[in-house]
Amino acid sequence: MPEIDALFESINVRDLLAGHDLNDPTTPLSAPDLRLLINRLESHSLRIKSKVQSYLVAHHSDFSELFSLCQDTVSRTRLISDDVSDVLQLVSDRPIDVEIRSVVDEITEKTKEVKLKRESLDLVNAIVGICEALQETKEALKNGRFRFAAERIRELKVVLRIGEEEDGEPVAYALLRKEWSNCFDEIQEVLAKFMENAVRFELDSSRIRIKYQLSVGETAGIALSTVLEAMEVIGILDYGLAKAADSIFKHVITPAVTHASTFAAVEDLCKSAGEVTEATLRLEQSSDHKFEDVDGDAMYSGILKVVKFICSSLCFGNVTWIHSFGRLTWPRISELIISKFLSKVVPEDASKLADFQKIIERTSQFEAALKELNFVSSSDAESRLSKYAEDVEVHFASRKKIEILAKARNLLLQCNFTIPQDIAMRNAKHIVCLLFSSERCVVSEAASQLMNLVHKTLEDVCVSSARVASEFYNAARDSILLYEAVVPVKLEKQLDGLNEAAVLLHNDCLYLFEEILGLAFEYRASFPSSIKEYAVFADIAPRFKLMAEEVLQKQVHLVISSLREAIDSADGFQNTHQIKQFKSAEFSIDQVVFSLKNVHMIWEPVLRPKTYKQSMCAVLESVFRRIARDILLLDDMAADETFELQKLIYLMLKNLSSVLDSVRSADETSRPLDDIIPSLRKTRKLAELLDMPLMSITSAWESGELFRCNFTRTEVQDFIKAIFTDSPLRKECLWRIDEVNQ
């Protein structure tokens, strides 16, 4: 009704109040405005009613048709509702759906029963068939029809799914599998007995016999080929041939390798009625038994003859059978050839490596012949014999490396680390020149021989191929490192005490340190280019330098500790004016002197002069400093006591004259001993102070003489207080000493 729609859209309240400002929402409408609005809305309402009435009158027929159609639709809906109600009433009175469901369930159950019975029948038929097949197999086995029995065993293995068992299978299947297993074991045992009967080795006549017509128990006239075919069918070829392969390897192949020069194999065939019934291989003494098989030609020829006999007489040229026999024997044959022949003909000298080429060629030809016979698989990429022979340089170098390391280890273990008293022998074997310091040094025989071995090995590196040179280089490094690993452990007990072995170890390490540093300069230029890239020795040199210092420092520490214990027995040199205390102090000094002389006797002949001087000075400094300190710590000394103390000091210095002279002679600078051993000057001065007047002591301090002797102000003052009684003069002297700035 477009007209009605247009009428409603034409109503606009704003137009009805056109005279009023409606833009301002806060402006209220007045009573006249509202009355005007009501009047105008009533007018519009009348107009709308008039329009609607006019529209209905104009479309009366259309509205009549619409109402009639609606009435017909309602009537039909009522009829359909009545029909549906009737159907529902009918269904509720007779439940046909329940009857249909019951029939369907019954049909399903019967179908399942029929299917189950059919499956059970099929299972029974299958079980009966398998049982009959197993029985036929047993009968065939008894009658000697091995090929038929073997094929049945193979078929039944598939049917019974041997090795593929599943949970929930019928119990009958488990029983049938057990029966099949028993049948398989039986045929395997029977075939093995026939094979054992077929191949025999007679020790007395040294021959191997292969029979072609076999019999075991009541079963006779079985062909060897039939037995082999049956074993192949059921997959026990390796098992069946294992015993024969072991016998042939032990009694035929092994002599062919170990006694190749005295071995000869002669093949013979035995015929009956035109058929070959037996093949024989006899081992005879070779007429050329005095000939030495240098290049392995006789050995390879003998083995090849045996293999050909096996391929033709035992395996009948069947590739599968030959492969099986080869798998069983070739690994052992190759290992035997390597251990008994190839490893023993590896050259012992690098110059003889070229002569080994003939053996390499003959070995390659031998393996190629075996591959041609299918004895060795052509896909076997190992070619273990050829590879071993071609790698002879590596084997040679490996063996030489083992020999070098064994020699190095033996000389280190056998050396007793002592120096003979015979000077001539010492000069000949134990004195070496240090490479960088140009000093002569006494070393152990082990160190000198070890470096001789290293030098010889590195000389071989310079003239060897890359692979050999690499092994020799590693052997040289490892030989040096063996010293570090072996000697300290061997001398472990000696290193815990004062002895010649410890200082020899120090010298050895120093000598090895300088020698190792010089190795690269001496040989690296002549090394093969591949070795130059990584050939270094400087990385292992510092550890020997460090070891030398540690050993020497430990010796010095042990000596100083021993001397301190000896000095401790003097009880601080107290009361030496008493006979008992004096004897104790004197014994302590004698012990110190004896120990120092013993150290002198051990160190001086072995250590370098410079090292001897430094070490002995450290020891003497410790002794003199300790004795001077103990005496200066005395807080009260009688006149007789100072005399006895002075006597002890002079006695000690006199008895140590030889030791002090050795230090003086070892010093290249010719400096006074007092400068080399500061506490020696202090000890000597202390002996003078013990009988010096008070004023002289004071003057000596004021002049700086005592300060230059390493006395401190406190030591001088305490010394004066200990010797001299309290008096104005002592106070004055102490004051004067205190006033001097030094």
Curated annotation (Swiss-Prot):
Record flagged with keyword Transport: yes
Cellular component, GO annotation: endoplasmic reticulum membrane; kinetochore; nucleus; spindle
Gene Ontology process terms (BP): cell division; chromosome segregation; mitotic cell cycle; protein exit from endoplasmic reticulum; protein transport
Phenotype seen when the gene is deleted: Accumulation of the precursors of the two major storage proteins albumin 2S and globulin 12S in dry seeds.
Compartment list: Cytoplasm, Cytoskeleton, Spindle; Cytoplasm; Chromosome, Centromere; Chromosome, Centromere, Kinetochore
Protein family according to the UniProt entry: Belongs to the ZW10 family.
Protein name, as recorded: Centromere/kinetochore protein zw10 homolog
Organism: Arabidopsis thaliana (Mouse-ear cress)
This protein's encoding gene: ZW10
